[in-house]
Amino acid sequence: MSFKIFVINLERCKEKREKMIKKLEGEEYEMTMAVDGKELNKDTLKALDVELLKQWKDPWSGRNITWGEVGCSLSHYNIYKYCVENNIENAVILEDDIDIPEKLSNILDNIIDNLNKEISNWELCYLSRKPINSEKENVNEFKDFVKVDYSYWTCSYIINLKGMQKIINSNYHKNIIPADEILPILGNISPHKDYYKYYNIQEPLNIYSVKNMICYPEGNAFEKSDTENSKIIEMYEDDLLVLATGTDMTDGLKRFINSCKIYGLKHKIMGLNTQWKGGNMADGPGGGQKINFLLKTLDDLNDDQIILVTDSYDVIMSANSKEIIEKYKSFNKNIVFASESACW
């Protein structure tokens, strides 16, 4: 065979595993233990050298990513890494909640053979998918395949070595989003263009699909899905940025910076080592230069970033980002002025 079949299954999901073993009787495959989102936290992500794309929001609900989605994404990513390290030419990746046809390997052999004949530059081919913009697809270009537009699902697909290498090279592990969102982004077929800048996309991933799906999600697949039904991640530590102006490293500024470090607050000192031209606050207005520093800094930040702007020379922080953000959210306002009592 010119491919290796991988089945992604959570260790605690014994029933799904046993069903897939029966469905794949007579086939050669590797049962791959999935990364369990229930066992992940920010410390385990750090140990894995993995980071979330904190700016990502679900395009339909606006929520953050779930721990189950992170586990799913890492499960697929780990297979890519394994195949690249072991020079596996083609990987067939199946999730454990799909129905598959009989004589799967024979069908896959024919699909890969036809892919190589019809489309020399293919890198990923869906075996099942949920097309979102099917009206944009040219179904007459190829006999057995279609060059896809924006599509969902990663429950069954073929990906070759070049495609897996592209995903690894994209810096995906430092900007994790759901698995079925990253593929359209890397293929330059996602409508969510704001996220493209976070990935190294030198050449788009060449994504196709079989015209007639050969695998289908089980009828209750989404009801029992760990990705859909797991805990939404609160981005407290990553969402808050403390901004303060300080042109000279005085004792007061050192105390302020030290207090930020004690409470684990991400902070940025604006204007450090810049000549102060704003005047003496004791004798008259002196804030104009601060505003200019702030405007320049805001231009480089994401629109979703939560910011605390504060003085520095006569201020120390006395709460962590989670507590500050919870108090900020309790106001139910985008901007809160004179919020000293809520923050320090």
Residue ranges and their predicted role:
Residues 254-258, 272-273, 321-323:
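Short coil/turn segments at secondary-structure boundaries
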Residues 21-26, 252-267, 330:
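N-terminal G-site helix/loop of the GST-like fold
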Residues 12, 214-215, 247-249, 274-275, ...:
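Conserved beta-strand elements of beta-rich interaction domains across eukaryotes
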Residues 3-7, 238-244, 260, 267:
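Hydrophobic targeting segments
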Residues 10, 127-130, 245, 272, ...:
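Active-site-proximal beta-strand/loop segments in catalytic clefts of secreted hydrolases
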